[in-house]
C-alpha cells in the first residue's frame, strides 16, 4: 500500500516525527512561576515549541460596578495568540477560536478558584501565546493554572 498525496506522513523512514522527536518521546517542558513583577501571579511555559505567558490580576474591584456579584467573585479569562505566534501572521483581533478557548479555560479553572471568598471582585487571567506549535490550548491551561497557584 503506497503513500497517496492526500495521506499525512507523521513519521519518516527512521521512525522520527516531523519535529525531530522519536515515536515514544514527549515534548520538552519548562515551567517558570512568578515571571511578571506587576501581576499577582504569573507563569511562563515552554511546551515543545510552544511559548506561553500567563498573568493573574486580582482579586480586584469589578468595573463597571453593576457587573459585580454580591455572593461570589467573577473569573475572567482571555486567551490571545500574538500575530507573530504562527508562521502565517494572524489578525490581532480576537478570533472565534480564541474566544471559545477563553471560555473553555474559564470553565476549567473556575472550580479551582474559591470565588465565594471574594464577593464583588474579579480575578483576571490573561494568557498570551508567544509561539504556537500544536498543543497550545493544553499548554495555555497549564500556564494559567500555574499562574493562579502563584497568585
Segments (PLM) and residue ranges:
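Short, Gly/Pro- and small/polar-rich lid/capping loops
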Residues: 1-37, 44-46
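A short glycine/serine-rich beta->alpha loop
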Residues: 90-94, 127-135
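Short, conserved phosphate-binding/catalytic loop or strand-edge motifs used
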Residues: 121-127
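Glycine- and Gly-Pro-enriched alpha-helical subdomains that act as flexible
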Residues: 135-151
